[in-house]
Every structure is written in C-alpha cells, then in structure tokens.
Amino acid sequence: MAPSALLRPVSRLLAPARLPSGRASARSKFYVREPLNAKPDWLKVGFTLGTTVFLWVYLIKQHNEDILECKRRNGLE
C-alpha cells in the first residue's frame, strides 16, 4: 500500500471541521431538556441498589465459604 493512501485518512482527522452550509446550520438538531437527575426514575434506582446489595452479600458469602474450604483442605481447621 502506498504511503499516501495511508496518510489520506489521517489528514482528514487533522483537517479543520467543516460547518454545514445552508439553512440546516441555523437550526439546532438538539432539544434543550430538563437534566435527567432533576427527576430520578425511582424504579431504576431501586433495582440498581437492590442488585448492588445482592451482589455484595453474595460476594461476601462466597468469600467466606472459599476461606473455610481452603482451611479445610490445608488442615488448618
């Protein structure tokens, strides 16, 4: 592959951004909305916190079982 072919995509990245011409540039494509954290979705918050608590409890329980198994195998108990 020729070096110029490799540099072509890089030169596009380094080139200054082109603004769209015509009427489209005068109107915003984005809508101004209320911030998402102004009105939280309590169902999602509950599921997220519940899942987090469940995973931590399961992790600690599994860790304790693994420690007991390790002690049993090594004859420490």
Swiss-Prot record:
Its main location: mitochondrion. It holds the Pfam family NADH_dh_m_C1. GO terms for cellular component: mitochondrial inner membrane; respiratory chain complex I. Residues 1-28 form a transit peptide. The chain crosses the membrane at residues 42-60. Keywords: Electron transport, Membrane, Mitochondrion, Mitochondrion inner membrane, Respiratory chain, Transit peptide, Transmembrane, Transmembrane helix, Transport. InterPro entries: NDUFC1. It is found in: Mitochondrion inner membrane. The keyword Amino-acid biosynthesis does not apply. It is a single-pass membrane protein. Accessory subunit of the mitochondrial membrane respiratory chain NADH dehydrogenase (Complex I), that is believed not to be involved in catalysis. Complex I functions in the transfer of electrons from NADH to the respiratory chain. The immediate electron acceptor for the enzyme is believed to be ubiquinone. Complex I is composed of 45 different subunits. Belongs to the complex I NDUFC1 subunit family. This is NADH dehydrogenase [ubiquinone] 1 subunit C1, mitochondrial. The gene is NDUFC1.
